[in-house]
């Protein structure tokens, strides 16, 4: 039995996430966690809400609530939605937890002891109307390069030119619109990442099995232009983790908090501590997952995230862990994803364009979405959601192949042999050929799943389902029954066992349908097969079963047209 630590990039607190967010981190992480558990491995699967930073403060203000109250409410909402999608986190934590406060302050103290922290006087824009320093992206104005009048203080979205806030013509606060701004001096802490450049470079080079997407982004940040730059890790905000050196105050840093991208990855560790506390476990129970001097040396740690999060996870967070000088578990494999687009464009919250996680669950069961998203995961390039493709995939894969097979074989057996597995008959060449083919498919499926090749795993699973339908079409037990009921009984018994096999193998992708199949076939606790050949004797003659309800209802053209119009972004 192996030990696997799995983390998904933690979703930001300010609102409900769209399907692109889901398929870029949490959903493939859940697929992998479910697969490893099914294979008998020990798994700790962690995620949390990312609750600090200016966007959280602004979202709370817009909602008319104190920021801590807003974050608590949104955490509860995101937690329920995650359950709706059957995301099997062992714990869904919060970056505002007491555990993350302690650990973040601890790491800052260790980095300072290692002489990896600089105190830097810098100039930032202060808004009198808002009573606060403004992060670069909360300053808008006219771009000096292209005259676009909504350029941000960090970059012009129109011409993509990198900017400083002082470059903008007629700058204004993006919060209040006020032009009553001034440049003030303020002191902040910087993590001296540049000192760790060679160490990080060698560490990344050692990860020969990482996706090209991951390593190319990391290398670009390491070597392009001026190379890896030191990074500010504090902000002038009210909401966040107060700046301390461990448990000690940090002179000159009063009233400041740690930057959200410094504390957010540390929440992966803090989340394990939260998990231990929530389950009345000891400190040693979470440390055995994270400290290589306390049992984590045999842990394989895998992270899942969208490509925009790769720089922080391949450089900044590893710099924190390495720089601390402590024996923390470093990531072994980082699975990154490209973007999912929506029907010819991007998802847009403000424009009501695209499907968000709560809306998806109101429309259709989680399995429909899980299957489409995973089978179209944006692994090697961006992918696109269209309602035509979604309808086709649900109907042709789930309804016509998996659902149809289970319905067909159980109904036939119930009609001809009753509601028990029939006895009689012996395998012929068709059965032996099928089982050889299935054993080969199972090996490929397991190889793809173990390698986190999400699309290939889905394709192989569908091929396994299809082999069942092809077998029934070839041997036609409904015709054989008329002249040779013994052989028809064997074919039907094998068909029922294939349905059970498909239910088990499908559990990481479509857990609700899998559970229904296993329950109706009388084997709710069926285990992952060693081989298909051995597994298909699980249901014995005389075992009772039930014909399940329709597993997957087809989507009509009318359904597709309704959904497409609803989420096009044209609604008021």
Swiss-Prot record:
Subcellular locations according to the entry: Cytoplasm
Residues noted as binding Zn(2+) in the record, renumbered to the chain: 143, 146, 156, 159
Catalytic reaction annotation: tRNA(Met) + L-methionine + ATP = L-methionyl-tRNA(Met) + AMP + diphosphate
Chain sites annotated for binding ATP: 349
Motif 'KMSKS' region positions after renumbering to this chain: 346-350
CDD domains reported in the protein's UniProt record: Anticodon_Ia_Met (cd07957), MetRS_core (cd00814)
Cofactor: Zn(2+)
Entry's Gene Ontology cellular component terms: aminoacyl-tRNA synthetase multienzyme complex; cytosol
Principal location class: cytoplasm
GO molecular function annotation: ATP binding; metal ion binding; methionine-tRNA ligase activity
Gene3D superfamilies named among the record's database cross-references: HUPs, Isoleucyl-tRNA Synthetase, Domain 1, Methionyl-tRNA synthetase, Zn-domain
Assembly behavior: Monomer.
Record function comment: Is required not only for elongation of protein synthesis but also for the initiation of all mRNA translation through initiator tRNA(fMet) aminoacylation.
Alphabetized HAMAP family for the sequence: Met_tRNA_synth_type1 (MF_00098)
Family to which the UniProt record says this protein belongs: Belongs to the class-I aminoacyl-tRNA synthetase family. MetG type 1 subfamily.
Name of the molecule in the record: Methionine--tRNA ligase
